[in-house]
């Protein structure tokens, strides 16, 4: 019961502030511009300088192969069949996001993740690694010291670890070598994407833009896209977009929605959720399995052997649930109070909410993630 109160209470605290009057947001907070996006980059490399926490090369042969290929580029040939133990080396995957409008010579952050069985990347240095896009072209070169946010220690079979040791970041660790051309407004229009389908919000955006720049400047393409006429000169588009994104718009009221995380039992709902009066019967089923060690001791001088075994007891309990009258609610506080009155834990609440939705008692979209 306390867990449910805490879970629903968080939702109430997070969304209770929305119960007031309608507020205005900037267009830049409600939309994104088509063509202005990041592009994913990926590369494969080696991290060296680890203090004995690298890959066990007998189990990760690709680390040895990569190491030999690197040495061959410097004119060093490793004899075939040589047994090399690289405890200070780890094979890694390097990922990064290439921002829009970035230029060659500028730097971006990279994430370094172990793909072998290295215990830790702390203190390691990433060797020069090419980062490529999905088209196979090289866009950046990464290299630098890996910063790990975790820590760990082990001795005599005991181990303590804080956070993750197999992945880290290198701030400004990659230098951009090639750019991705981003076109904004070159076709005479700019597309604004709201990210979600909401005809009311789209229409409010159109009205606000036309009020600022004049009639027919913007028009709705569909329930999530707005087309805006852009200046013909590229030099004028930057200032135009800056003014465009700072226009304040009042979003339309969102659809009533309840989101449930089936893995953690978290429940979040917005202020539009309404609950019709209904009756709920909730029962609990518990299964308890207990195992006790049993030792069979032979009689003296019987030449028998002592045998150890186990005895398991299985107990099933089912508690009948009484019918609870759930009062309807027209605001978020009433809905939270009514759901808490059921007394179910968060996992059981998922089934109850599904049943309420099927009975048309829950006036909201139910989404389980």
UniProtKB/Swiss-Prot annotation:
An example Gene Ontology molecular-function term: structural molecule activity
GO terms, biological process = bacterial-type flagellum-dependent cell motility
Q: Which GO terms describe its cellular component?
A: bacterial-type flagellum basal body, distal rod, P ring; outer membrane-bounded periplasmic space
Localization annotation: Periplasm; Bacterial flagellum basal body
* Keywords of this entry: Bacterial flagellum, Periplasm, Plasmid, Signal
Source species, domain of life: Bacteria
User: Is Signal set as a keyword in this record?
Assistant: yes
Q: InterPro entries, alphabetically?
A: Flag_FlgI (IPR001782)
Q: Please state the span of the N-terminal signal peptide per the UniProt entry.
A: 1-24
Q: Which NCBIfam families match?
A: PRK05303.1
User: How does this chain assemble?
Assistant: The basal body constitutes a major portion of the flagellar organelle and consists of four rings (L,P,S, and M) mounted on a central rod.
Question: What does this protein do, in the record's words?
Answer: Assembles around the rod to form the L-ring and probably protects the motor/basal body from shearing forces during rotation.
* PANTHER family noted in UniProt: FLAGELLAR P-RING PERIPLASMIC PROTEIN FLGI (PTHR30381), FLAGELLAR P-RING PROTEIN (PTHR30381:SF0)
Cited HAMAP family: FlgI
The entry's family comment says: Belongs to the FlgI family.
Q: What is this protein called?
A: Flagellar P-ring protein
Q: Which organism is it from?
A: Ralstonia nicotianae (strain ATCC BAA-1114 / GMI1000)
């Amino acid at each position: 019961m306390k867990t449910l109160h805490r879970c629903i209470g968080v939702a109430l605290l997070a969304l209770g502030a929305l119960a007031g009057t309608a507020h205005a947001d900037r267009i830049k907070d409600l939309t994104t511009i088509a063509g202005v996006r990041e592009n994913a980059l990926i590369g494969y490399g080696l991290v060296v300088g680890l203090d004995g926490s690298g890959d066990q090369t007998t189990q990760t042969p690709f680390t040895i192969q990569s190491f030999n290929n690197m040495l061959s580029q410097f004119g060093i040939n490793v004899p075939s069949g040589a047994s090399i133990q690289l405890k200070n080396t780890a094979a890694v995957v390097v990922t990064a996001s290439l921002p829009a409008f970035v230029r060659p010579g500028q730097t971006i952050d990279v994430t370094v993740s172990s793909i072998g069985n290295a215990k830790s990347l702390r203190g390691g240095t990433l060797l020069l690694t090419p980062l490529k896009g999905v088209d196979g072209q090289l866009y950046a070169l990464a290299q630098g010291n890996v910063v790990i946010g975790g820590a760990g220690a082990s001795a005599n079979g005991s181990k303590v670890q804080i956070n993750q040791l197999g992945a880290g970041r290198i701030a400004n660790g990659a230098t951009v070598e090639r750019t991705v051309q981003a076109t904004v407004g070159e076709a005479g229009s700019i597309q604004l994407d709201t990210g979600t389908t909401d005809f009311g919000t789209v229409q409010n955006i159109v009205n606000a833009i036309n009020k600022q720049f004049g009639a027919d400047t913007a028009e709705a393409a569909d329930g999530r896209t707005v087309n805006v006429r852009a200046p013909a000169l590229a030099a004028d588009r930057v200032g135009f977009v800056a003014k465009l994104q700072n226009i304040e718009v009042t979003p339309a009221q969102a659809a009533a929605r309840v989101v449930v995380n089936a893995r953690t039992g978290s429940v979040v709902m917005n202020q539009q959720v309404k609950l019709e009066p209904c009756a709920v019967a909730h029962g609990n089923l518990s299964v308890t399995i207990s195992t006790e060690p049993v030792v069979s001791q032979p009689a003296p001088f019987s030449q028998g052997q002592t045998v150890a075994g186990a005895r398991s007891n299985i107990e099933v309990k089912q508690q009948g649930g009484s019918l609870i009258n759930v009062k309807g609610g027209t605001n978020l506080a009433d809905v939270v109070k009514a759901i808490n009155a059921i007394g179910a834990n968060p996992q059981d609440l998922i089934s109850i909410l599904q049943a309420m939705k099927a009975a048309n008692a829950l006036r909201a979209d139910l989404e389980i993630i």
